[in-house]
Amino acid sequence: ISAGVFREPINTLTNLGFMIAGLYILYTVSNESSFNDFSGLNKITILYGVTVVYLGPGSMMMHGTNTEWGGWADNLSMVMYIIIPWLYNIYKMSEWSVNTFLKVYISIVIFYAVMRGLFGYGMGIGLDLFGVSIGLWVISEFLYRFWSPSMRFISGFVGFLVLMIFGIFPSEVFENIADYWWIIFFWLPGILAGKKPNGSRTYIWYFAGMTAYIAAWLIWLQGNLTINPDSEFCNPDSLIQAHGIWHILTA
């Protein structure tokens, strides 16, 4: 922890990785021909690239200031990014237009920004929209790959597999259902995905990204003072910060 310009210098500066990644995405799509909704310069690719860039400044505001408003900006940037993949998948499996996709996206972002600002983490209703959106992304990818009328219902149960990866088992969920009421959102993709998507996808980068994210999360746990108070990675003055590594890997 520093008394200088940045309260957490390493954890602040490692956010440059998101900005570099986002700018590279925008550079790449601006130099390629458009062959689907996620190639070439269009409303969706520009939105995606810009939100990746904003992950950097959003997190910088939190780690650089250690303030409540900085935490709000950080959480907002994370939500602005993570809702895009599952909303995009729903767009591809529904009758949504691009403008409908954008209107839904903007509505969710504004709702979260206001509720997070007024009521703090959980928005006063015990909903971690970022965490739930990780599950919705996996669920919607599963449904995209295996879409059928019956899979629209079955896909919701994939959310429990995601929870188990993060150490939360069904027994805990149903014993504390008041805290996990948000599992009902696991069936949201199935409800909205009314048609089989066109085309197919390759998933090598999807699984590579998920692997990097899980590795980053495991490293992040090592630097979490609440979970590992005696860990060498919890030294705030060290140049090697687990949270900084988390930033680099997730970028």
Please give the residue ranges for each predicted region.
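Early transmembrane hairpin module of multi-pass membrane proteins
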Residues: 1-185, 192-205, 211-251
